[in-house]
């Protein structure tokens, strides 16, 4: 019998997840969004899941803000609703109905280069850090309370198209860049990993850092982009303070060795992933 998968959220990441999982003939996949039904209505969601008998719920919805996370400082109520209240409700409903949730969330709850942060480290850029952005605070708040599901932390996602939410697209269009090294996530790899979780029937509660290892700094990324003739002639490096952002930013490296050691999934390093993405974009 085919596994039934409900994907909630048809944005940047959710759309990618649906496209690949929907092509898997062993899966029966449904994509829902705010435009198709009110997934914030717990009673409706319960009835819907009972009726359809889903095995997995992939939480790909959330508040990120446009054009960036500064918007969370303005729309705090919406940010809290979609990053904290709704995911917690998903976990509660799934636990009651014996459905496995997979939460796609953010690793921006860490900051600093003291170490490569692992899943067992206590987040230092969230609820208990007064300098944290509200976006990071909301992500940490959810995780600090949530007690069910597989939580996948990603950072600065990029893909093999010029999607306006992709790190590559953002870097390409920005004139002013910050020189920093950060973990990043190649979305096609993430989708492969989620597909593996579903195919293998993974269940329970766990947290996984999913970022391509050996992260590049900003200069390394734009050097690769220039190699593929994807360049902005106005690029220049500036100090973060000159950008007049409403919120601080997380800068950190996440340790993603757990993906290989406990899940048997081989992640290419960041340079390989960027080359693959840029080759597809410029083909």
Feature locations, PLM:
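Adenosine-cofactor binding site in Rossmann-like domains, unifying the SAM/SAH pocket
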Residues: 29-48
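NAD(P)H-binding glycine-rich loop region in Rossmannoid oxidoreductase-like domains
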Residues: 42-84
């Amino acid at each position: 019998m085919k596994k039934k998968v409900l994907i909630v959220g048809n944005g940047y990441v959710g759309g990618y997840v649906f496209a690949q999982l929907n092509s898997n003939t062993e899966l029966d996949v449904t994509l829902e969004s705010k435009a198709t039904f009110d997934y914030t209505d717990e009673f409706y969601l319960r009835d819907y899941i009972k009726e359809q008998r889903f095995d997995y719920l992939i939480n790909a919805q959330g508040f990120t803000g446009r054009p960036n996370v500064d918007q969370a400082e303005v729309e705090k109520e919406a940010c809290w609703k979609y990053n904290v209240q709704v995911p917690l409700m998903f976990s509660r409903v799934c636990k009651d109905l014996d459905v496995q949730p997979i939460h796609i969330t953010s690793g921006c709850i860490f900051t600093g280069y003291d170490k490569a942060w692992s899943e067992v480290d206590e987040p230092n850029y969230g609820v208990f850090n007064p300098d944290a952005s509200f976006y990071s605070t909301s992500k940490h708040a959810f995780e600090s309370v949530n007690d069910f599901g597989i939580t996948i932390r990603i950072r600065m996602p990029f893909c093999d198209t010029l999607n306006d939410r992709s790190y590559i697209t953002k870097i390409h269009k920005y004139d002013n860049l910050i020189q920093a090294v950060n973990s990043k996530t190649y979305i096609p790899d993430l989708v492969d990993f989620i597909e593996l979780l579903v195919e293998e029937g993974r269940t329970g509660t766990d947290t996984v850092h999913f970022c391509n290892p050996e992260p590049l700094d900003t200069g390394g990324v734009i050097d690769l982009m220039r190699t593929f003739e994807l360049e902005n002639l106005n690029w220049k490096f500036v100090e973060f303070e000159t950008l007049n952002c409403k919120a601080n930013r997380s800068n950190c490296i996440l340790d993603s060795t757990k993906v290989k050691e406990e899940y048997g999934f081989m992640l290419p390093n960041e340079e390989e992933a960027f080359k693959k993405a840029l080759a597809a974009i410029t083909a």
